[in-house]
Curated annotation (Swiss-Prot):
Residues 10-62, 63-117 form the HTH myb-type domain. Keywords: DNA-binding, Nucleus, Repeat, Transcription, Transcription regulation. Expressed only in flowers. Residues 38-62, 90-113 bind DNA. Gene3D superfamilies: Homeodomain-like. It is found in: Nucleus. The gene is MYB305. Transcription factor. The keyword DNA-binding applies. It comes from Antirrhinum majus. This is Myb-related protein 305.
Amino acid sequence: MDKKPCNSQDVEVRKGPWTMEEDLILINYIANHGEGVWNSLARSAGLKRTGKSCRLRWLNYLRPDVRRGNITPEEQLLIMELHAKWGNRWSKIAKTLPGRTDNEIKNYWRTRIQKHMEQGDQSSSTTFNNGQMNLDHSCNDQASSSQMSACGPVVDHTAVDQSSYSPHSFNGNDHTFQAPFPTDQSNDNMWSMEDFWSMQLLNGD
């Protein structure tokens, strides 16, 4: 029993980027006949593409209401909010953003938002680790400082005070002595050498 020959259209299915000619064929056909069933549309339009390829090309790029340009900050906030609520339900999210396709939103999320969030998590982790290291070093420095204060050499203030004293000055039986750092008040209450010799002369007379 002989096998039936394969459909030539199945063999010649085109893959890869769409050409401008293919885009114009698809646009004109849908403008005249509507979307319909995509597998039948591809054959009827004479395109050597699968029905899925025609559908994605039309919905994501060729529709008149497809919004051009970069996603705005407002749209980005809405995408982040809805993704936190619905997860990866890109078609549902796309319905809240007129002119944006589910494929466009999915690509934007993965290449821009998700990547930025992952980098932010890594940066936060690095900052935390650095801060912890600085805190540990600070604690170690404080501990070392406290240990040095507790175990370091103790200054003998008594020895310093004793070494700063001048020898007592004796004159005969007089035991008056001058402090090493006299104040104005101590000078007023202490006899000078001139006063002392004056008293000696008076006693001699």
